[in-house]
A protein has these predicted regions:
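A generic secondary-structure signal marking the coil-to-beta-strand transition
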Residues: 5, 13, 24-28, 227, ...
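Short hydrophobic beta-strand segments that form the core of ligand-binding sensory/regulatory domains
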Residues: 27-29, 87, 241, 300
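Charge-rich, well-structured scaffold segments of protease-associated domains
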Residues: 3, 8, 19, 63-214, ...
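Active/ligand-binding-proximal structured segments within catalytic/core domains
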Residues: 12, 19-70, 144, 252-264, ...
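A signal for specific C-terminal beta-sheet/loop modules enriched in small/flexible residues
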Residues: 28-34, 48, 104, 218, ...
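Histidine-centered active-site/metal-ligand motif
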Residues: 48, 52, 152, 239
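His/Glu-based metal-binding/catalytic segments typifying zinc-dependent metallopeptidases
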Residues: 20, 29-31, 214-271
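A generic "binding-loop/recognition-motif" signal
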Residues: 13, 195, 268-269
């Protein structure tokens, strides 16, 4: 039995319904194929800016209405923008689901985009940019993508720049929405308890307009660029990202990559955590993650470390990566599988997590992989696949290294990359 019902309108809009009669609430969201990967230099940050502006009022609701209605229903009406999509979501009691969705739908399809509101919001977004720039870990992550994908839009910052934000006009926002907020690149998802007929009727009211554009445009493959990039900044702790090219969202190898990330840095028993923190006390936090996008993928190790411990921490991390392909065991792989699948099963007890998985999967891949199929793919990853893929992460000469802070400097990192002691 499918995990959700899918209804596709003639114009390409997709509605996903996953009913749970035992629930007392409904989690819902609208996903749109608008993100920083679809922006030019002149429109950098426009997807995120639109996300802000829809909360400033719509055809039926003022900004005060939006806030008070959401508060009255007890839900958290929120949104986020990523590299490949924008999402508007909430969770409310089942009886309030139609009203909550009508609120989101009107915001998304009929935002006011008032010029005065836009000028005020420019200041808000510029403050948000300043906040992220003041956080070394966030700054390092953004800079990593910029230098790892310098010729591709995957490297663009979701927030944009102060110059691009300050140049935005209502007409620019409307043109972007006309292009990317088309029915064919929009997905709505409901998980929990709701009145099916009312939801379908509301979707027809708000999302049945003729499609004026095609679905999400295809992006070219993103070329990954290894190298060393040092950004000097006065910080109490240096931030390091060591990243490699990894499987994209359309590749089944991404499941092996997720398990490698778990074994190396995804838990308290992972190799990097044990070696750098528990055995040597070099870091408080070290992480390994696998991120897959439509045009590329990234496997990255990130850490925050003092300058005094930086060299030893980086050399130790390099050693762990180098040793891993030849020393990883079946026992470690079994542990990683169990850790991954246990987390998945527990997360899917949340209707909000299910809605996010279904909506994102439908928008980007044309369908979310089922829990059963995902378990089969995770269980099906062999030790040979792990070893083969891990070898592409074993040499820092293949890595893009981004370091922010009062770091050990380019000379040290270039020596590490070259393999010299």
């Amino acid at each position: 039995m499918p995990e959700y019902e899918k209804i596709t309108f003639e114009n390409g809009f997709r509605l996903l319904l996953s009913e749970d009669s035992r629930a007392k609430s409904c989690s819902m969201g609208v996903w749109v194929g608008s993100g920083s990967c679809y922006e030019s230099d002149d429109t950098a940050g426009i997807s995120h800016f639109i996300e802000h502006m829809v909360f400033k009022g719509s055809a039926l609701y003022s900004s005060e209405d939006i806030a008070s209605i959401s508060d009255r229903m007890g839900g958290e009406l929120n949104a986020y923008t990523d590299k490949e999509c924008t999402c508007f979501y909430t969770r409310v009691l089942s009886a309030d689901a139609p009203a909550a969705f009508e609120l989101i739908a009107d915001m998304v399809t009929s935002p006011r985009l008032d010029a005065d509101d836009l000028e005020l919001e420019k200041g808000v977004v510029c403050e948000e940019i300043a906040m992220y720039e003041s956080n070394p870990a966030d700054l390092c992550a953004d800079l990593f993508y910029l230098v790892a994908f310098p010729e591709h839009k995957l490297g663009k910052n979701v927030l944009g720049t102060r110059d691009s934000v300050n140049s935005m006009t209502p007409d620019m926002l409307r043109k972007h929405m006309d292009r990317f907020y088309s029915p064919a690149s929009t997905v709505a998802c409901f998980c929990g308890k709701f009145e099916r007929d009312k939801i379908i009727s509301l979707c027809k009211r708000y999302f049945s307009s003729p499609a004026n554009k095609s679905a999400i445009p295809a992006l070219p493959k993103a070329d990954f660029c290894p190298g060393v990039h040092i950004f000097d900044k006065k910080t109490e702790q240096n931030q390091i990202v060591i990243g490699f090219s990894a499987p994209s969202l359309g590749s089944d190898s991404r499941f092996a990559c997720q398990l490698i990330a778990s074994m190396l840095g995804g838990s308290a028993s992972s190799r990097l955590f044990r070696r750098l923190r528990e055995e040597q006390g070099l870091v408080y936090s070290v992480d390994a993650c696998a991120s897959s996008y439509l045009s590329a993928g990234v496997f990255a190790v990130s850490m925050g470390v003092s300058r005094e411990s930086e060299k030893k921490a980086v050399l130790t991390a390099s050693e762990v990566l180098r040793e891993f392909p030849d020393t990883v065991t079946e026992e470690e792989l079994d542990l990683a599988r169990d850790h991954y699948l246990s987390g998945l099963i527990m997360s899917l007890e949340s209707n909000s997590a299910r809605a996010a998985r279904y909506g994102t999967g439908e928008l980007l891949l044309g369908g979310a992989i089922s829990e059963k199929e995902l378990e089969e793919k995770i269980r099906g990853v062999s030790i040979d696949e792990i070893r083969s893929l891990a070898r592409s992460f074993s040499s820092l000469s293949d890595a893009c290294i981004c370091a922010v802070g009062r770091t050990a400097g380019a000379k040290f990192y270039n020596k590490v990359v070259s393999g010299k002691k």
